[in-house]
Every structure is written in C-alpha cells, then in structure tokens.
C-alpha cells in the first residue's frame, strides 16, 4: 500500500527548541512559502495548516500558497459553531476551485472552553458534537449540489444552495479526529478519513477497530491516518540526541503551565496524550522509538518517532499494517526537517507521490442573475 505523507505549516511558531524563545525564528509569509515549496518538491501529498487563536488564519495561508506550489494539497480546518455550514461550503468550493482540486478539510470541534468562549461558543462537549454533526450534514449536501432545508437543534437553513461547485467530486475529502465515543460516532457516520494522534500502536489499533465497526454499522468504510512528529537522523544515536536537544531549554515551570492549560480542556484525545508522560521528563520513550517529549508543552499531537531512516520506516509500517494510509508529520525546525524526512525516511517507504493536477476546461459563465442563479444557454426551437 502506497502511503500518503503530509507535512505541517507551523503558523503558530517554529524553532530549534521547545518552550523557549531561544533558537526561534520569524514566521512570515516567506518562511511558510519556503516550507510549502520544499514539501511540494519532495513529494509530500499535502500540508496540514493548524487552526486556533495561536495560529495565523489557515484559509488565508492556504490561499496564499496556491500560486507558489504545483501539486501540494492543503488540509484546512472547518469550524462548526464558529462558522455557518453554508458559508463554509462556499469557502470550501472556492478554495478547491482556486487550487484546481487541491483542497482537503479537517473538521475541528474545539476543546478549550476559554478559547471557545472568546469565539462566542458556549456549548459543552456533547452539544459541540451535536452541532458538528448537523454542520457536516448541511456542508456535505451543499457540496453535492443539493438545495438544502435543514431544521436541527443547532442549525437551521432554508433554501441553501451552492452556485459554484468544487472541482473534486462528489466533494473534497473530509478528515476528522476525536477520541470520545461521540466523536468516533461522528467519524463513522460522516467523515472520509479518521485521524488519531500518535499513541502506541496497540492503542491506535483499538481506536481503529472501534471506528471501523461503527462505520460498518452505518454501511460505510472510511480511511485512517495518524498525526506524528518525526526526528530522523543518519543514526539512531544522533536521532535520540536531537530529541533530547529539542527539550534541553525547557524548564519545569513552563511544563507545569502547559499541563495546567491542557487540563482545562474537555478533549479526550488531549487527556490521552497527557497520560502518556504525566508531565514528567523521565521515561519519555513510551513505545519502541515513540517519544512523548513534544507533548510536555505542545497541545494536540505530542509524540515523535525517533531513529534512523530504516528504524522510523519500520515503525511507520507497523501503523500502516493496522490500516493507516495517511501520515501527517512534522519536526523542528519545519524547513530543515521537511528535507531530512524526505531524504532519510522516504527512500525506505512506499510513498505515494502526487501528480500535478491537469488544468480544468474553461467554461464560459455569465454574471449571476439576481444573485440567485447562473444563466444557461436556452435551446432554440
């Protein structure tokens, strides 16, 4: 099975060390463009662009990278409760059209009550997933070309429609990750690819089996992906030294503050990440070559595969054997590590190299009539 390898655009900061300003670098458009172009040249399928108040806006960043890349896809966040599904569908179709079919979407419900309140969202965990399920139904139906009437608990639309369809049919793929039962049910019923953070393979296997069974109950099959950091070097010793160096400027106070911030979230996945290290520096290798040091201060994905190219490839293939076909990777700093992964890891894997999309046929289009419909030729009698 060929593997889809993604990279990451660090719109919330980058550098040589975690938890410190030392060794950091400016995150401007030029730097992000360098990373995107490196990923494009090296054969990554796409890049994940993060979302939230600590990041630059993912949609604007993605749009700005379209003209400077050729085949790279952009995995950007859909935010139920923050954005209406009709507006999100228009945005999704436009990004897909402008990128010539290079848009992918990641459903993000949110987990930090403080950040959600700042965005005007006061729903609890269960309510957010209810709203996300309704959002996704409307969003998908619009992209399928339907005129939508929907009267749900959280979302109400009447006569909603999309005048400009996406390039990808029936619609651009929808990714999603969540560890709670309600999240897995949403994934099973509505998404195309279920993402998990990089837990030990036996825990990932349990997740996949649960989601696969839930999807089968809905008569569906879905794909699977994993989100991991990577520290790959020419030798295993060099890789582990690089891992230790990454947290060498990290003090206990910063770790404690980070763990306190994570504790206030209602994310089951974040709780599972924190339980892998319990905020302690010792015993960070939680599974062969799987290191939890990143999660001491980084929210979300907090584990890294560490080793030389063949060793890391063997661990990736262990995940692939569970049914995972997509790997969303990152490393610090992201420009240099994109090359290291491409040069030291990719030769040991069956990597699916994306093709450059062909131009779409030019279809003449008149101005929308009364902001309501696109004029079509009428057959002459």
UniProtKB/Swiss-Prot annotation:
Give this protein's Gene Ontology molecular function annotations: alkanesulfonate monooxygenase activity
Q: Which SUPFAM superfamilies match?
A: Bacterial luciferase-like
Q: What does this protein do?
A: Catalyzes the desulfonation of aliphatic sulfonates.
Q: Which reaction does it catalyse?
A: an alkanesulfonate + FMNH2 + O2 = an aldehyde + FMN + sulfite + H2O + 2 H(+)
Record carries keyword Flavoprotein: yes
Q: Which UniProt keywords apply?
A: Flavoprotein, FMN, Monooxygenase, Oxidoreductase
What are its GO biological-process terms? alkanesulfonate catabolic process
Provide the protein name: Alkanesulfonate monooxygenase
Q: What class of enzyme is it?
A: oxidoreductase
Enzyme nomenclature, EC number: 1.14.14.5
């Amino acid at each position: 099975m060929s593997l889809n390898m993604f990279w990451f655009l660090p719109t919330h900061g980058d550098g040589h060390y975690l938890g410190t300003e030392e060794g950091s670098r400016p995150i401007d458009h030029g730097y992000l463009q360098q990373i995107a172009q490196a990923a494009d040249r090296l054969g990554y399928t796409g890049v994940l662009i993060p979302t939230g108040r600590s990041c630059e806006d993912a949609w604007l960043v993605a749009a700005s990278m379209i003209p400077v890349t050729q085949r790279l896809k952009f995995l950007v966040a859909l935010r139920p409760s923050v954005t209406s599904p009709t507006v999100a569908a228009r945005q999704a179709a436009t990004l897909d059209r402008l990128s010539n079919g290079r848009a992918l979407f990641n459903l993000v419900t949110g987990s930090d009550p403080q950040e959600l309140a700042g965005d005007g969202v006061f729903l609890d965990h269960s309510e957010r997933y209810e709203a996300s399920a309704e959002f996704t139904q409307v969003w998908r139906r619009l992209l399928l070309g339907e005129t939508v009437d929907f009267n749900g608990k959280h979302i109400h639309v009447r006569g909603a429609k999309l005048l400009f369809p996406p390039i990808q049919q029936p619609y651009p793929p929808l990714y999603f990750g969540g560890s709670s039962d309600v999240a897995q049910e949403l994934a099973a019923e509505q998404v195309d690819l279920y993402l998990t953070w990089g837990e030990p393979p036996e825990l990932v296997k349990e997740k996949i089996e649960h989601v696969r069974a839930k999807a089968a109950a809905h008569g569906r099959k879905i794909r699977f992906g994993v989100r991991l950091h990577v520290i790959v070097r020419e030798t295993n010793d060099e890789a582990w030294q690089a891992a230790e160096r990454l947290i060498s400027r990290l003090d206990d106070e910063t770790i404690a503050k980070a763990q306190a911030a994570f504790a206030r979230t209602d994310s089951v996945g974040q709780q599972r990440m924190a339980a892998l290290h319990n905020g302690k520096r010792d015993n960070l290798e939680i599974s062969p070559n799987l290191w939890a040091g990143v999660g001491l201060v980084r929210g979300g994905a907090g584990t890294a595969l560490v080793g030389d190219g063949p060793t890391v490839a063997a661990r990736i293939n262990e995940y692939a054997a569970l049914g995972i076909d997509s790997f969303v990777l990152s490393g610090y700093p992201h420009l240099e590590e994109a090359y290291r992964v491409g040069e030291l890891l990719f030769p040991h894997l069956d990597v699916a190299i994306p093709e450059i999309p062909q131009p779409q046929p030019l279809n003449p289009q008149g101005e929308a009539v009364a902001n309501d419909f696109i004029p079509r030729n009428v057959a002459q009698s």
